[in-house]
Structure formats: C-alpha cells, structure tokens
C-alpha cells in the first residue's frame, strides 16, 4: 500500500518516510508523483515525502496495480485534470474502482476502454 501512503503523504503536513522492503521497484511510482508536483525523493528502500498544500495536474503512467490506485487518489486532490494512463493495472486488482469512487463523490471519468 506504499503508493497510496505516498499519495496521502504528498498533501499531509510534515515529512513522511515510507519503506518498501519487498519490491524496491515499486518506489518508481515516486517519479510519477513528482510529475504531479510532489516534494518527494527515493533513498534506497525508502521514499521521503514532504507534504505540500496542493498537487498539480499532469499526465501520469501507472506501472502496477498499487501505483495506479495511488495515482488516481493523488489525481483526485490535484488542481485541474489528471490523466492516468495504463489503468488496466488497476482493473486487475480493484473491482469497480471508478464506480466506487464515484459513489463517494469523486469527480472521475474513465475515458476509452
């Protein structure tokens, strides 16, 4: 769940350190968060994230299930419209993801198949 924690930390007060001990490549997600304006960096098995008041919209690419979900969550709090590409990853792990977010009041639209 590191990508979701990183998305939350990106707009939380203070500095957070999120550790990934199993799949270090999962932290590649941090680069996509930086596209959204996050103040974040990786240091080995750790992501260090300093919270900022607002993320910015940008096109981002999902590399796996969790990264996709984290990018969608970050996009929901970003200023403007964020396009998350390669969402087929999300489909593999989260049933009715968009529909569930819509039911919670999210402004989200799935474009294409």
From Swiss-Prot:
One of its GO terms (biological process) is cell wall organization. InterPro entries: Enolpyruvate_Tfrase_dom, Enolpyruvate_Tfrase_sf, MurA_subfamily, RNA3'P_cycl/enolpyr_Trfase_a/b. One of its GO terms (cellular component) is cytoplasm. It holds the Pfam family EPSP_synthase. It comes from Mycolicibacterium fortuitum. The lineage of its organism: Bacteria, Bacillati, Actinomycetota, Actinomycetes, Mycobacteriales. Pathway: Cell wall biogenesis; peptidoglycan biosynthesis. Gene3D superfamilies: Enolpyruvate transferase domain. Cell wall formation. Adds enolpyruvyl to UDP-N-acetylglucosamine. This is UDP-N-acetylglucosamine 1-carboxyvinyltransferase. GO terms for molecular function: UDP-N-acetylglucosamine 1-carboxyvinyltransferase activity. Its EC number is 2.5.1.7. UDP-N-acetyl-alpha-D-glucosamine binds at residue 22. Belongs to the EPSP synthase family. MurA subfamily. It is found in: Cytoplasm. PANTHER family: UDP-N-ACETYLGLUCOSAMINE 1-CARBOXYVINYLTRANSFERASE. Its main location: cytoplasm. It catalyses: phosphoenolpyruvate + UDP-N-acetyl-alpha-D-glucosamine = UDP-N-acetyl-3-O-(1-carboxyvinyl)-alpha-D-glucosamine + phosphate. Keywords: Cell cycle, Cell division, Cell shape, Cell wall biogenesis/degradation, Cytoplasm, Peptidoglycan synthesis, Transferase.
């Amino acid at each position: 769940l590191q990508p979701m924690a990183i998305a939350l930390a990106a707009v939380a007060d203070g500095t957070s350190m999120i550790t990934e001990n199993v799949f270090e490549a999962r932290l590649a997600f941090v680069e996509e968060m930086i596209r959204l304006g996050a103040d974040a960096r990786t240091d080995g098995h750790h992501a260090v994230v300093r919270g900022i008041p607002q993320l910015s919209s940008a096109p981002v690419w999902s590399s796996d299930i969790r990264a996709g979900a984290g990018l969608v969550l970050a996009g929901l709090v970003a200023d403007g419209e964020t396009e998350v590409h390669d969402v087929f990853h999300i489909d593999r792990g989260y049933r009715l993801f968009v529909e569930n977010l819509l039911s919670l009041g999210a402004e989200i639209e799935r474009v294409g198949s």
